[in-house]
Amino acid sequence: MKLRLGMSPISWSNDDLPQLGGDTPLEVCLSETREAGFVGTETGGKFPKEAGALSAVLAEHDLALVSGWYSGTLINNDLESELERIADQLALFKAVGASVIVYGETYETVQNRQERPLSSRPKLDDYDVAAYGRRLTALAEHCAGKGVPLTFHHHMGTAVETEAELDAVMAVSYTHLR
């Protein structure tokens, strides 16, 4: 298998903190991504949300869509509601040929809430981890069935931040979650 590398647009501008590169145009991000030798990119807040427009802007820079962040809330949400929430992004990623969709658990995250200290982040132990794993597995199976596998991204300020928390989630999640 040939390895292809993609880049994240957060290297140019941060969707959570727009004061960090918020004035950097998408054109700069994409042209510099390609100039650096990357063949793909993740999505970000500045990217078109319609398949034709997204495909066109990527083609202008000879880039593929490799992935993109999805702010999930399965830890405190039912599967059917989450399937509705992810549907548009999943369809977009399928249409544009994304390799994966990146799930981050964002229920009650401290991100975008600068008045809250990191220590006030949600704690995984406050939730039914086994039930969460079952819902996460079902979502991953659904996404894989649509041709866009789901990957899991632990993140600072969320209920799944530490290595131990990530291990706990992975221990109760199954085959289709990467």
Model-derived features: positions:
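N-terminal pre-domain/capping segments
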Residues: M1-V100, D126-T137, E141-V148
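Active-site loop/turn elements of alpha/beta-hydrolase fold enzymes
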Residues: G45, Y70, E105-T106, H155
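Short, small-residue-enriched loops and turns at beta-alpha junctions
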Residues: I75, E108-T109, M156-V160
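Active-site groove signature of glycoside hydrolases
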Residues: A95-S120
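Glycine-rich tight-turn/loop motif centered on a GG-T
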Residues: L118-D128
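Hydrophobic, aromatic-enriched interface-forming segments
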Residues: P149-M170
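Conserved small/polar residues in nucleotide/adenosyl-binding loops
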Residues: T175-H176
